[in-house]
Amino acid sequence: MGIKRYVANKDATITNAFKLDLSTRATGSNMGEADVTEIFSIYAQATTSSIEKSRALYEFPITDITTDRTSGDIPASGSVDFYLKLYNAKHGLSLPRQATYVIQPISQDWDEGEGLDMESYLDSGSCSWKMRNLENSWTTAGGSFLDRNTNTGIVFDKTL
């Protein structure tokens, strides 16, 4: 059987990093229309003990995947592998030699939003570190995820 490609329906970056003033967190910022998603962790940006993170959210066409499985276009569960391919966008910052990424299914629906600003975090609305859409907050700030211990979740280390 050949390779079947599924592309994300929507994506967004959310963060709790500090804005340029280093006193206000960007927890209300939205980066759903940016041309890339960012994954980062910054230690001691504002204080010696502060930790700032971002999360890249992706929604894939699960209904299409289920339909393809039912129709026999892809093999039954347990006999097919799915791969998530992400690429590094060219930038002037250094990459970590080693990083650990946790990939988990999101437990609540969310809106992509129209934010573009990934520097000053001036765009708000839709999903953010605090909100999953304009009206509803995440159950847990930073996104609500299914429990990795009871659901499919992946942790992998990347070494350059």
Question: What does each model-found stretch correspond to?
Answer:
Residues M1-L160:
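Secreted, disulfide-rich extracellular signaling modules
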